[in-house]
Amino acid sequence: FRSHKLPVDAFIFDFEWYTTTPDYTVAREGKEGYSDFNFNPKLFPHPAKQIADLKAAGVKFIGIRKPRLGNNLLLNTARKNGWLSHPDSDSRDLNFSSAKLRQWFENKTKPMLQAGVDAWWDDEGESYYTCYYWWNTAQYHLLNDVRPNYRHFTINRAFSPGNQRFGYCTWNGDIQSSWASLADVPKDLLNFSLAGMYYGACDIGGFHGTPEKETLVRWFQAGVFFPIMRAHSDLGTTARFPFLWGEDGEAAMRKALELRYQLLPYTYSLAHEAYNT
């Protein structure tokens, strides 16, 4: 990014940052040795130093989290303590409305923040209505403990009333890489705003599939005016990095990003006003 003169402020890491495999096929009782609260040693053998190097380059580290456990021993502890949201099902989701569970979760998560993680991408927490609220409550409390006066931020796939207090962003889910999806994004973000969620976002370029170059360029241009501008895509598609889309595509996306940064005093002021009112 720097060598191509493309501004970037954060890398948002998917599950590979803490585990080698996703947990979608993990059984009800969990998997032996599954990593829920550690860095993936293949990608981050020296996490504190690697994150410090990112920060020295002006880049924040944001990591995805899931509202469930994959490790069999941790799952057994949670099940014995009544900390699962649907204990009689195959679900491994945690019941974050439990104060004791939140304290346990904070203790498990704390080393990640101490290693330098800046913020969280909370995904797949739709199993019960207040999951995202209580989940963010735990994360907010922990961040204030580890880094007092540090501004909390999470990006989430859904929201409920009251989440605005957490520096909380909602994105509109795993959408298609199509012109129709691009056209829907402004409507989605306006609906979020009308419901009180002023930090809205989408996957720039869409999540599923690979967009046409012009579609991606137009998406970057539209994203200049979104509250949060974040590119993301599914595995097996062409990443939305501008330098992968030819010189003309890169130049157009760079120009859009530069406009985004020129507008930051304006958008930052609006964010401050929204928070205070």
Features from the language model and the residues they span:
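Catalytic-domain carbohydrate-binding cleft regions of carbohydrate-active enzymes
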Residues: 2-277
